[in-house]
C-alpha cells in the first residue's frame, strides 16, 4: 500500500441495553456465562513451494482500540476498581494489524485454507501483537519449509465485519468532500437476543431528563445532544463530566446540536439504564471488547477493571448521521473538531484516534472534555461524589438561546493526542513530549489551568456561573512519575499553515484566551471569530514525521521528530482564529498569535501535504537519494520526495495549490509556509518569482515530442526564475519586480530561451543521466523536454519541489484530484513519447491497422515497470553530447539486450492474452490475424514465409510489444504470420505435448481399439499442465476453424497435421530414432485432435464414455522399423535385412494400405497419376505406328503396378536383364548372384526418417506430386552428382520381389531435374543430337529412358522381366528416343522458386552418401570405354539405356547426356559395340535393386 497505513478506527455496532445485574467480564464488560458464536482463530500449516514460496502476500493496518474499551480503562483507573479492591491497570494502545492481501491460486497457502482478508494472529506460535510489520515479515521469511499461521478468518473477524468499507474501499486514497457524505457502515447481523430492561436506576439517570425512552442518558452521546428538549443543569453537567473524565466539565446543551439524529448511537461496554439497544449490537460490542481484551498485552503492576464506562460513539463510525448543516469546508479530516459548538455544526468526521495513556479519542470527547494523560489516575470516586461536588463548568453548555463563549475552541483544534505504539519508531519519539496542550476553555475546570476567559452566558438551567473546582485527586496524581513520562503522549494540534512552535519546559498548562465577544448563534456556518488556533510546530511536529511500516524512517527523523498519531494521516487543521496565550504546563508548546488563513481551505490542504508526501515515498527513494528525506538549511526543511512521477501525479493537485496567494495574504508572512519550506520563503517578497538561481540546461525534445536540433542540445548556463506558471531562462540575473516579470514574459531575446510553461508538467530527477550530477528532467504539457543541472543535490531537490508546487493546471481542484484524468494524461504522454523515438516502426500510425492487436500489445507493455515507462524515448540518447565522465550508478542501462519475452521461453513465462491468461499473447494474436484474413488463403500454414522477415519479427517481439507497427508490411503477409506461429511452438523449451507425456501419447496412438485409443488420448490431454492444456485447446480450435474452410484453403486436417505434427508432438531433444519411429504417430495424433476437437476439449464429461469413432475403426501402425538399422551405419549391398530409403518409404506407404488408412491409397495413387497418363498417351501413339518394341512390353508390364492390367502384354520382350547378359562379361561383374533373388539394399544413401517420411506424406496435398517428388528426390540428385554412373541401371528394375515393389511411386525427371545443375549442363551439350535423334524417325512409344517409365519399370514382375529380351537395334533406337524426350521435358519444365530450392537444399543435408563396392563402373571408366572406338558409343548408349530403366532417373539422365553428345547413333549392324554392355547391365541391375 506504498506505506499508507489505513487506520481501522472506532467500533461500529450500536449500543444495546444490557441488564445491569449481569456480572461483567474481567475486561470487556461482557458476561462470561453468555455464549457467543465467535469461534476464534484457526491454525494453518503451510508448506513452502520452491516456485511460489508460501504463496501469499500481506498488508498492514494500524488498528486503534474502541472508544468503549479505552473509556473503560480510564474509568476503572479513576475509580480504582469497581469492586473496591485494587485491580491491575492496563493500557489499550494502537496495534499493528496484518491481513492477507493476496493468495496465489493453487499455492501452498491456498491449499492450506488461507484466504484473502484473513488476519494474522500468530506466526509459528509467536503472537504478532507487539511486533511491527517488518518483524512479522522477517518471522515468515525466516521460516523453514513449513509455516504455522494462526489466523482469524475474514468472515469471523469483527474488525473487518464492522469496517469492511473502510478496510477495502478507502484504504489507498484520501477522502475528499464533506464529512456528512461518508457512507453508513455495513450492518452486522448476529442472532438477536432480548434482554429485560434494567431494574435499577443510577444517579446519572436522575440527573438527565429523558424525553423519550430511546434516548440514551449519556450526554456525551450525540443522541443525547440531539434532543432539543433535553436540558442539563450545570451540576448535572459537572457530574456527568466527572463521571467520564474524573473531573467536572460542562457539556454542550442539546440545543447546540438541533440537527443531530435522535437515534441512540452511543456504543458502550454496557448500556445506560433506561436505554434500549438491539441485542445484536450488544453482542457485537461484547465480542469486540472481548477480542481487544485478549489482544492487548497487560503491563506489570496494572490493575484490571471489571467494567467499562459508557462511551460516546465516534462520528466516523456513525458515518456522520449527526452532521449539521454543511460548513463551507470541502474536505474531511480525520481529527477535526466534531465536538464544536452548535452554530459551527459537526461537519468533520471523527476518527477514533485512541490514546495510550489518556486512552481517549480526541474527537469522541465532547466540546468541553479533554484529559491529559496525567489525569488518567484520577479515581472515579468523583463520579460517585459528583452530587455533593459543586458544579464547576468552565464553560456552560450553550443552549439555543445563548451563544457560545467566544474563546471556546473545539477539542480537535486543541491538538492531537499521540500514543505509545508497539512500533519502535513510535516509541523513540514519545520521550520528547509529556503533556497535553490545551487551548480552550473546557479545561478551565482542571485545577492546573489558569484561564482568562470572557464571561459567557449560561442557560437558565444553570444554577451558578462556572467556576474552577479541583477534583478529589490532587495535582500530584495528575503528574506521572518520571519513569512513565517517556511513554506518555500529548495532545497537539497541527495548525494550518505550519508555523514553528517553541517548547517551554513548564509542567503546568496555562492557557490565556483572548477576550472576544461571543459569536451569535446565527453564525453557525461561519467562522468562529472568538476561536483562535495555535500555529503549527516545525516539521518535526508535523505529520510528515509519521513512520509508515512499508518504508524505513530516517534516524534524523526519529531523533528530532515529535510524536504524532499515525491515524492523523489527514491533518485536522481548522478554519479558526488562533488564541493568544501560552501553555506553561506543556513543556513542548508555545502558541504564537494572529490569524493568517482564510475560508478557502488552502491552509487545511497545505497541512495535509507533508504526511501524504511521506506516504507515497518508497524505500527506493531513500536508498538512491541518500539523505533525500531531510535537508535542513537555515530553517528550511525538505520533505522526502517520491522518485516516481506517476505516484506524485496522482496527488499533485492534492498537495500543491499552485500559488502563494493564501500565503502571501497571511498576516504572519514572516513564518515560512510548510509547503514552501525548500525555498527561503521567510525572505521572499511579494513578487511573482517563486524561486530563482543559476542552472545549466539543455533541451531534448521540442513541441510534440520532436527531437531537438543539435544547437539546442548543448548545455548552457542560465539564470532561472520560477513564476506561477512559467520558468524563465536568461543569461543574466534580473532583479525581481514587475519590470523583470515583463522582461521575462517578453522573453526571449535573441540569446535567451523562451519561458518554459510548467503547467501540468512532469518533473523528477533524471535517473538516466549518468554523465552529469544533480540533473533533473522537466517535461511540459506539450511534450517539450528539458534537462537542468543544479549546483548541488539540495538545490536540485528544491527546484523539483518548487516546480511541482507551481505546475497545477488551471481549474484543478487540489482536494479532488481525478485519478482517471491523470492516468489519461500519462497515457497520452507515453504514446506521444513512444512515437518520438528513433524507430520508424514505432510511429503512432501503426495503431490504425489491426487496432485490436495493437491495443493487445500495448496493454501488455503497460504492465512493465513505471521507471522504464515514464522515461520518454528521447531520454535514451539525451546524453550523446554530454561529457564522457560518468558518475554514480547507471540506473538504467542503455542498449542493454533484454531477455526474450516471446520466443524460446516457457509457456508460463510468456505474456498472456487478455481473453485467456493461460494462452500466450503471440499465439492469440497470430491466430486472430489468420482467422481474420487467411481462412480462404490457399495453403495457409503450408506455404512458408520469408525467413528473414520472420526472424526480424521474432527479434522485435522479444524486445517487447510496445513498439510494434502493424502497418508494417511484415505484418501484412499471412505466410509470415503463420510461420511466426509455427516458429513459436518450435522454439518452446518444452513442447506443447510435454516431455514426460510424450511416450504416453505415442503409445496411446498405437492402441488398436479405436474407442480405447480416443479415451486414452483424452485423458492424457486432460492431464497436461494448465498453460499447456489451454494453449493446445486454443490452437486446435483454431486449426479446426482452418480445416472447416478446406474447400477454399485446401488445408484438410490431414494437411494441417503434416505441418503441425512434428512441431507440437516432439521431445525437447532432437532424437533421430524418435524422428524415424514416431513421425507417423505425430501426424496421426494432431489429425485426430483436429477432427474431434469438440470431443477432446469439451468441458462436460461423458457419462457413457461415448467416443466419436467406432470400436472397429482400425489404427495404422506404420511399419518403419526397417529404417532404424540404417541410422548411423552402411548396409552391404546384399543384406536381406535392409532396404533402400526410397523403396522403404514406398514400403511403408504400402504397409498402410492393408490397414485401410483413410488416405493410404491416395498416397500411392497420387504419385503415379502424371506418369500413368503420359504412358497411356505414348502407348496409344506407339500402337498406332504398329511397332512392337520392348517399350510396349514395359508399359504393359507396368500396368499392374500403376493400376492398369494387360495380361496379354506380359510375354512381350523386355530390355535386357542382368541374369541374361551376365555370362557375356564374367570378368567384370562376376561376384553377386542374380539380384532378383535377394531383397533390394541401399548402399548409397541413409536418409533420416524425418525427411523421408515428411517427403513421403507431403505428397498428400500435392496435386501432381510435384512438391513431394522435388523434395524427396533431392537426395537422389545429390547421389547422382557424387556417383552418377556407378548407379547406372537398366530395365532390371524389376529384379527383386515384385510384390514388395509394386507400390513404389514413380518420380518424373522434370521433378527431379531442377536442382541438378550438372545434368542440366550435360543435357545442354547433348540437346542437338538428342533432338535430331528424336525427330529422325517416327514417334515411338516412351522409351525406358523417360522419367516416368524408368520408375514404372521397377514395378514389373520378375517373370515378365525374364521372358522378354528386345533386340540390340531396338534397344539402341529406343535409347536415342528416350534421350530426346527427356531433353524436351527439361526444356518445358517450369523453374522453381528460390524458396523451393532452399527447402530442397535443406532436405539434402539429411542424406549421407557412401562409396559402393561397385567401383568398377564409374563415370571415368565409362568415358574411357565410350571413347575406345566405334563400338563404344553404342555401348555407352546401351549402358545409358540400362540406366534409364532404373528408379533414379535423374542419375540416368546425368549419365545419358554425355553419351548422346559424344557419339552418333551407330549402324544397326554394328553388333560388336555391345559386347561390354551385358556386364554393365548386370551391375546396374544389382544397384537398382539396392536403390
Curated annotation (Swiss-Prot):
Q: Which residues form the signal peptide?
A: none
Q: Which PROSITE patterns match?
A: PDZ, PH_DOMAIN, RHOGAP
Keywords, comma-separated and alphabetical? GTPase activation, Isopeptide bond, Phosphoprotein, Ubl conjugation
Concerning SUPFAM superfamilies, the annotation shows:
GTPase activation domain, GAP, PDZ domain-like, PH domain-like
Would I find Hydrolase among this entry's keywords? Answer: no
Q: Which domain of life is it from?
A: Eukaryota
The covalently linked position for Glycyl lysine isopeptide (Lys-Gly) (interchain with G-Cter in SUMO2), per the record, is 854
Region Disordered: start-end pairs: 15-34, 204-280, 385-407, 449-530, 831-851, 1126-1155, 1175-1367, 1420-1491
Question: At which residues is there a site annotated Arginine finger?
Answer: 942
Q: Give the sites modified to Phosphothreonine.
A: 656
Claim: Nucleotidyltransferase is one of the keywords in the record = no
Instruction: Please give the tissue specificity annotation from the record for this chain.
Output: Expressed in placenta, prostate, hippocampus and brain medulla. Also expressed in brain tumor, salivary gland tumor, head and neck tumor.
Q: Where is the composition biased (Polar residues)?
A: 1138-1148, 1245-1257
In what residue span(s) does the PDZ domain sit? 71-155
Among Gene3D superfamilies, the record links this protein to: 2.30.42.10, Pleckstrin-homology domain (PH domain)/Phosphotyrosine-binding domain (PTB), Rho GTPase activation protein
Query: What's an example Gene Ontology biological process for this entry?
Result: regulation of small GTPase mediated signal transduction
**Domain PH: where?**
688-808
List the biased-composition ranges (Low complexity). 1345-1366
Bias (Basic and acidic residues) occurs at: 482-491
Q: What does this protein do?
A: GTPase activator for the Rho-type GTPases by converting them to an inactive GDP-bound state.
Protein name, entry field? Rho GTPase-activating protein 23
| Gene behind the chain | ARHGAP23
